[in-house]
Regions:
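Short acidic/glycine- and proline-prone juxtamembrane loop motifs at membrane-interface regions
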Residues: 123-131, 170
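Membrane-interface transmembrane helices that cradle and orient dolichyl/undecaprenyl
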Residues: 99, 138-159, 185-186
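Extracytoplasmic catalytic/substrate-binding loops of multi-pass membrane glycan-assembly enzymes
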Residues: 29-43, 53-66, 74, 226-229, ...
Length: 442
């Protein structure tokens, strides 16, 4: 057995030990946590079990189907912890193979598994862990494609497309991912020549068209809107609610109701964000519209407001984009029985959030710098997979900020480790260069 093989096994053992022990401890001491969205996912899961007869289209089917298959909250919690372990091991493999060093692989894996924003989400009955899992598998497949020319077959493209599509059906803000992956893997530079490979384009887009396109067609047939869900109009109001007083008199009833609820929300929370969810029942009662008619109407109103208030819309997009990088941790300190450990965890989370926010800022600066400077690209030895990660994060930050303005910090969670991986690569690139020089001297 070579020294390198021993090192790989040693660091893999360290990663496994830490990841398993952390999740066992979490499962034994911290319960599954429900949020305001959880009940709607459970309702949709019941509809899945009944053959979609009463499926209301408010949620894409990925997470409800997962809940339907797995069952009770505690079982879902355990399953999500298992998914977190698989994600951790995937980062170990990618870090190991990309750098050739098991220490870097272990650092990448532990950066994921020790991030409270990740392991606490594995306890939350929300979509993030499942979305992270499907995205990780899609990126893992893309890594294999880029690093192993012999694997560049249609079947691998289909698997990548399947995972990216399931990520979309779990968290619809990732609807761009199949197209992004297909385009990125289809084009490559050999020397100074741009090469095109049709296999990833066909392989990745085929399951996306069948799964995501098929689902959107189902929504269109049943609810008369071509969208991943029936909530599009409500999400747009998250943007336009800031200037809803400019809604035309034609929709005065909806406008006035929203403004009343907005004022109340600002008094209670200091922000108008998520006002629409409180206002929906009153809007339906006043207009006689059902949930879907109201969503379509609010979408029409919001599109008009955006067209007539482009700079206000842009300012909210930029605000949402900035919030995207804030590295939140969704957890419930009240369920930790021992006050001492709850206090320790609060300190740990504060420190982790500060470090992650700094990492996010470094990511923004270094990706922009690398895009401009050829010298930096060469110095940092940026492989195509690093650019794939960077592009995925940037696209998510922009796309999510355009579509919604409410829980923007939450939108980065599935790709937070991709940001950390990029920054770790920047930090270690000098060491990689020295190792390469040492091998050449030998």
């Amino acid at each position: 057995m070579t020294r390198n093989t021993k090192d790989v096994r040693l660091w893999l053992g360290v990663v496994l030990a830490v990841a398993v022990l952390l999740r066992v401890a979490l499962f034994l001491t911290y319960p599954p946590v429900s949020y305001s969205d959880t009940s709607s996912y459970r309702r949709s899961a019941e509809a899945v079990l009944k053959g979609f007869e009463a499926y209301d289209g408010t949620r894409t089917p990925g997470y409800p189907a997962f809940l339907a298959v797995v069952g009770p909250d505690r079982a879902v919690y355990a399953a999500q912890l298992g998914l977190g372990l698989i994600i951790t091991l995937s980062w170990f493999y990618i870090g190991l193979k990309a750098s050739g060093n098991p220490v870097f692989g272990a650092a990448a894996a532990l950066a994921h598994t020790l991030n409270p924003g990740q392991f606490f989400f594995e306890a939350n009955l929300l979509t993030e862990t499942l979305a992270t899992f499907w995205l990780m598998l899609a990126l893992f497949g893309a890594f294999l494609w880029l690093e192993n020319p012999g694997l560049r077959k249609v079947w691998l493209g289909v698997l990548i497309g399947l995972c990216a599509s399931l990520a979309t059906l779990t968290r619809p803000l990732f609807i761009f991912m199949p197209v992004w992956l297909a385009v990125f893997l289809s084009f490559s530079f050999e020397g100074k020549k741009l090469k095109f490979n049709w296999r990833p384009l066909v392989g990745i887009l085929l399951p996306a068209i069948l799964l995501v396109g098929g689902w959107m067609r189902w929504i269109q047939v049943n609810y008369h809107v071509f969208s991943p869900s029936t909530m599009s109009g409500y999400h747009l109001v998250q943007h336009t609610g800031y200037y809803f007083e400019d809604v035309p008199d034609e929709y005065a009833v909806l406008r006035d109701i929203y403004l009343d609820y907005r004022e109340q929300r600002i008094v209670e929370r200091g922000t108008q964000g998520n006002t629409i969810w409180d206002a929906i029942p009153a809007m339906q009662e006043a207009t006689g519209m059902n949930f879907y008619e109201l969503s379509r109407t609010l979408q029409e109103i919001s599109v008009q407001l955006i067209l007539t208030h482009p700079f206000e819309f842009l300012s909210r997009v930029l605000r949402g984009w900035w919030l995207f990088w804030r590295a939140p941790v969704y957890w419930d300190s009240s369920v930790i029985a021992a006050p001492f450990w709850a206090g320790v965890m609060k300190v740990f989370i504060t420190g982790a959030r500060g470090l992650l926010f700094l990492t996010n800022l470094i990511f923004i600066i270094t990706t922009a710098a690398a895009g401009i400077s050829r010298r930096l690209r060469e110095r940092w030895q940026l492989k195509p997979f690093l650019w794939l990660l960077a592009g995925s994060v940037w696209a998510t930050s922009i796309f999510s900020s355009i579509l919604d303005h409410g829980d923007n910090p939450r939108f980065l969670v599935p790709l937070q480790t991709a940001v950390v991986f990029w920054v770790m690569w920047m930090a270690a690139s000098g060491w990689f260069n020295r190792r390469a020089s040492g091998r050449e001297l030998k």
